[in-house]
């Protein structure tokens, strides 16, 4: 028998909404930061690269926090923590790994962006801002894989 759809309890709806909203904000912030940083790659004025850094701080970081809080909320409400690690589905592991490692990479990108913005005031920092934008693009690819895993739920 093939499962066409699965239902979950309505008590989890708000937690899932918070998780998905945070993920959408995070991905939107990463798209904006990556595109602005890559378009402004050769910009001598650093304007787009600074906008990219600001987007990481103001959009992507809060989105990551909301996404992670929502994920933990769903995890506890669905009682996934009661299962042995062997029985937890692959998509859940993909989500945790991408969120945790992605959070570390996001923090590295934020530190580089912050130092780059500070140095940009005195005429430098372009390489740090470019690296921050490149990390945002890498994170975007990683989180697209996570969105696929969460949506498609392979095994």
What are these regions (language model features)?
Residues 2-155:
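Polytopic transmembrane helical bundles with strong interfacial aromatic enrichment
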């Amino acid at each position: 028998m093939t499962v066409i759809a699965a239902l979950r309890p309505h008590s989890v709806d708000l937690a899932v909404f918070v998780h998905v909203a945070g993920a959408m904000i995070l991905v939107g912030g990463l798209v904006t930061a990556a595109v602005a940083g890559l378009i402004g790659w050769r910009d001598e004025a650093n304007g787009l690269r600074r906008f990219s850094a600001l987007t990481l701080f103001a959009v992507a970081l809060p989105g990551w926090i909301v996404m992670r809080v929502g994920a933990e909320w769903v995890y506890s409400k669905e009682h996934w923590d009661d299962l042995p690690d062997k029985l937890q589905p692959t998509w859940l592991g993909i989500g945790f790994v991408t969120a945790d490692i992605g959070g570390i990479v996001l923090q590295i990108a934020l530190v580089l962006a912050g130092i780059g913005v500070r140095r940009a005031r005195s005429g430098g920092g372009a390489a740090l801002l470019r690296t921050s934008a490149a990390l945002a693009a890498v994170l975007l690819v990683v989180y697209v894989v996570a969105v696929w895993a969460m949506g498609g739920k392979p095994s």
